[in-house]
């Protein structure tokens, strides 16, 4: 979708992006605070930011409980979500264009005027515990926090996170919210039709009743080469594997794009060098690789599942093809095919306001710099 993007600095200290998409029938918003797990006051209440996020759409200045708020918010089909990471707590909405201002007001109330209470806290602590218990049946979610710990990241694994839930009290919720949900610590991205409403949106955001606060820095981990991690599960019928190659720097968008092309060559389709060949040999049903880049480090991750009898041959194939890539043994035809595939997927990935907002968020919320969409194909 054709669009233009503008960075906005508000008088209250917040900043973000307004993305004008002429003719859009939907508006998408994303409001993010550096308030994730790494900003919990201490490790004994590590899961606190996650519980704060769960309480985001509960009781507030206008609605007595989550059910009343939900009924009002969704009555015309609007969608909302919230999520927590090591660094961020993020609140997202998507709505029909005709009710953008109503939804923005509801988002303001939920973010700026929550009414935390014991009843909802008790319920959401139980819900978070249930969520984490469910994740413990997902071997990938068991594996990756242990890998993070092995390379020196200051995180807890799922079992450790569950143990901290019982320690969280209402005073902790209120303290974390007051400290982290401030104007200077907020980034926003709003994508949709801006004509005739740009000033109204800016004025509305500047009137959000948030304290100025401070902008938190993203913690930097002292990364190291990690020892191999083994998690034994009696109920596991195969091997779930994962390994990560880490570099201690942020990758700019052009390098991320290049690495995604390499991921496609190695694991993108059944025509790829690792996954495709493994499928052809009957070694693996599914595996892949991906790239993630934060403020101070970047991760090239591989994972999948393999039957025990096929593991040695699969890992040998992975090693062989990765060494070829390291030595520059990539055919021109494979490189051109990866670029062609990437260009098509790039254009397909900008068909909705939410997709466009997510594209800009990937770089902006980490570095607070703007990677123009139209520059990427070059």
Locate the predicted segments by residue.
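Charge-rich, well-structured scaffold segments of protease-associated domains
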Residues: 59-62, 67-215, 220, 249-250, ...
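His/Glu-rich zincin catalytic helix
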Residues: 1-68, 164, 174-277, 315
């Amino acid at each position: 979708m054709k669009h233009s993007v503008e960075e906005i600095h508000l008088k209250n200290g917040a900043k973000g992006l307004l993305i004008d998409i002429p003719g859009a029938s939907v508006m998408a918003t994303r409001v993010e605070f550096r308030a994730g797990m790494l900003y919990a006051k201490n490790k004994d209440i590590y899961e606190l930011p996650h519980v704060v996020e769960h309480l985001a759409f509960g009781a507030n200045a206008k609605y007595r409980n989550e059910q009343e708020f939900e009924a009002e918010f969704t009555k015309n089909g609007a969608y909302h979500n919230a999520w927590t990471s090591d660094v961020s707590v993020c609140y997202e909405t998507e709505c029909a264009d005709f009710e953008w201002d109503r939804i923005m007001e509801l988002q303001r109330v939920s973010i700026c005027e929550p009414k935390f209470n014991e009843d909802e806290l008790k319920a959401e602590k139980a819900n978070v515990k249930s969520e984490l218990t469910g994740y413990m049946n997902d071997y990938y979610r068991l594996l990756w926090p242990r890998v993070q710990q092995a390379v020196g990241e200051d995180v807890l694994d799922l079992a450790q996170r569950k143990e901290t839930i019982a320690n969280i009290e209402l005073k902790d919720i209120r303290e974390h919210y007051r400290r982290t949900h401030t104007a200077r610590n907020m980034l926003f991205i709003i994508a949709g039709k801006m004509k005739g409403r740009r000033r109204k949106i800016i004025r509305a955001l500047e009137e959000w009743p948030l304290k100025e606060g401070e902008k938190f820095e993203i913690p930097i981990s002292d990364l190291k080469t990690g020892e191999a991690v083994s998690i034994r599960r009696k109920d596991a019928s195969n091997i779930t594997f994962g390994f990560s190659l880490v570099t201690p720097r942020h990758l700019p968008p052009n390098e991320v794009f290049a690495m995604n092309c390499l991921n496609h060559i190695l694991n993108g389709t059944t025509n790829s060098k690792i996954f495709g060949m493994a499928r052809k040999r009957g070694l693996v049903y599914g595996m892949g690789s991906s790239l993630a880049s934060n403020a101070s480090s970047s991760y090239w991750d591989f994972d999948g599942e393999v039957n025990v009898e096929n593991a040695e041959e699969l890992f040998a194939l992975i090693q062989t093809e990765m060494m070829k890539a390291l030595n520059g043994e990539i055919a021109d035809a494979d490189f051109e095919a990866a670029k062609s595939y990437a260009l098509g997927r790039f254009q397909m990935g900008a068909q909705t306001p939410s997709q466009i907002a997510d594209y800009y968020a990937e770089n902006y919320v980490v570095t607070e710099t703007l990677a123009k969409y139209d520059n990427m194909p070059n």
